[in-house]
Amino acid sequence: MIESSQPPFCQADVSGSASVDLFGQPIIKNELLKDRFGEVPFTILDSRSGNWKKRKQKWLKLNIKSEVGRKDFNNSTKANNFANMNNDKYDIGGYHKLNSESGYASIFNPALAELLYNWFLSEGDEILDPFCGGSVRGIVANYLGYKYTGIDIRAEQIESNREQALNILPVNNQPQYYVGDSLIVLDDFKKHYDCIFTCPPYVGLEVYSDLNGDISNMDYDYFINSYKQIIEKSIDKLKVGGWFIIVVGEVRGKDGYYLNFCGKTKDIIINAGCKLYNEMIYITPIGAKAMTANRLMKNKKIGKIHEFVYVFRKV
């Protein structure tokens, strides 16, 4: 249990300096943008930088293990076959980690969650995550002073998330987790949230269970239909003026062509009552991509080392 009255990841004081020179003019401090905002607030978010790696390691020292709870996820089956067919592997807002239970599981980067929360939210804001998956986004949110509610269809994943949160956060500052299909669970939610912050599974590339309602195991057309309905119901629970933040990446179909998943995602959110406010490119580490570049280029495919972060606002 972390016992600290002041979390090490609090937002920087950006109120400016009260110091003045001999002529009464304000003295401008030589302050780096990354020190003021955590990272430079530009449209490129580079997780390969030294500053980013340091921030991520600080979070991992809290013993966040988002891959735990995925022992039924087998990358050697449908997900891996799909990826191998396309000669590619993907991250979703994070990085891959090998563990004995789950094989390679994508882990949401805690430094990305920290950055986006602090850039767009105010202390105490309430967050809804209809595709919560692992523990990262919930633990980071509540550690920073926000209030997170996540939904996942897999009971073992939610059990793991709750256990990790109890080991890291005070008992009176716990993320709220719900087990079930978001299409159904959201119908019972009465409150409205300040932010929706989520990262959906890649269709065909990340299969977490064979449960009915788990969109990760659906064919593309069924996936898009359920995905659309969940997003629409989530936006119904978003306050007017609230933020919808989503991390997504493009995927290829069985014919090798991109499916325009990112474009469809934007259309769904806009048609549900939001407007696109910011768009960022999140660069992931090259890692194993360097070893697959030759194979990819045989099929004229460029190795993908980026995701998109879309920030919408409900109007």
Kindly label every feature range from the protein language model:
Residues 1-315:
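Class I S-adenosyl-L-methionine-dependent methyltransferase catalytic core
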